[in-house]
């Protein structure tokens, strides 16, 4: 599925105007958060789509299946070296991996096999391996090396292919479990050993590269763990934290080489609080946890649970989108081809945006804005003054209508301001006149349900319906 387009975002005549409310405008803006590709220019650079970025990151066209072989699975071996006669680069001062490094490297390997058709089997002793791990401490001249971080070699049939090397003088390399940058480094170097390149033509130790050298706009940690450049270059903010698993463009890139792993999390998965994923980067146990991830999920009915945060959050369930979670910006994304059905906000003033699936959105405490989009959605505002936004007749049809499950009369609002662009809306009491742009509230006292109907201009029949648990008044509707 693509991004939810029912909020009139593809129609110039429905651009933001004085006709639409601040709640509608906040959703409209959020749906354009990190728009990419399609000829856009961002930061003075060409913007790449996910597929374009994946092609760029795999431009060497090498994998463990050979050259120019795409979408083919691979069963690989890995090894933690115990001793070496030499290091391919000429560096010296070999040190074998410590227990903490081994643990973190295995988690990095797991994060790659979660998203692509890769299996990793550890070997020991004299057995050779596709991917190897070792530390160094000195450069080729025997001097202590404090400048470099790590490096790795692409797949192939040459001496050193698939080997990865880490500077043991760096504290985040020696203790990667306590310093997020160490885990990020392991995942980055394993990416190279699997065939992924940097998004641009740069390398450590070659001049003084910067984001100015980026080939395309989305070359940052926000989009790729293979990047050199901080997430702030593309408008995100991780507040000094680092991601430790493949990001949205990395997932597309590694799947281009080895195919997508369609056995990963096929059940009902929860990401964030109350997570059942058994992955540390998908799991929050308290509000201090900085979640930085791109989700890959192969099936089931899945939930983003960000209920433990008190920050104002923006949560978008559309594939390819980014969310602002737990006080960070642009820190959670959804990989291409993934459907997340449900979202739970926290106690701040949140914006929740659904996709074309039948979503369950729960705002929680705070003054929240909920937009379900297409599909038959169930919306819970929770405590606070909440606004339920509708952008077009496609958002809640007679055949697939939304439920607003906890509406508070006189407190919550239902926002129909987007429909003003077709002409001023007016209320009718018992039946429509046929003129269009008419709204009718129908109270079902026996079941304590309000039916909200809307007949749009230019439509031969009434095809917009929202069902509301509880009674709503005309003053609760923004028209």
Swiss-Prot record:
InterPro entries: Hemolysin-typ_Ca-bd_CS (IPR018511), Hemolysn_Ca-bd (IPR001343), MetalloPept_cat_dom_sf (IPR024079), Pept_M10_metallopeptidase (IPR001818), Pept_M10B (IPR016294), Peptidase_M10B_C (IPR013858), Peptidase_Metallo (IPR006026), Serralysin-like (IPR034033). Its main location: secreted. Ca(2+) 5 binds at residues 364, 366, 368, 381, 383, 386. GO terms for molecular function: calcium ion binding; metalloendopeptidase activity; zinc ion binding. It is found in: Secreted. One of its GO terms (cellular component) is extracellular matrix. Disulfide bonds: none annotated. Keywords: Calcium, Hydrolase, Metal-binding, Metalloprotease, Protease, Repeat, Secreted, Zinc, Zymogen. Hemolysin-type calcium-binding repeats lie at residues 344-361, 362-379, 380-397. Ca(2+) 6 binds at residues 373, 375, 377, 395, 402. Ca(2+) 7 binds at residues 382, 384, 386, 412. The active site is at 189. Pfam families: HemolysinCabind, Peptidase_M10, Peptidase_M10_C. Residues 1-17 form a propeptide. Ca(2+) 1 binds at residues 265, 267, 297, 299, 302. Ca(2+) 4 binds at residues 355, 357, 359, 372, 377. Zn(2+) binds at residues 188, 192, 228. Ca(2+) 3 binds at residues 346, 348, 350, 363, 365, 368. It catalyses: Preferential cleavage of bonds with hydrophobic residues in P1'. It is an enzyme of class 3 (hydrolase). CDD domains: ZnMc_serralysin_like (cd04277). The Gly-rich repeats may be important in the extracellular secretion of this metalloprotease. Belongs to the peptidase M10B family. PANTHER family: MATRIX METALLOPROTEINASE, MATRIX METALLOPROTEINASE-21. This is Serralysin C.
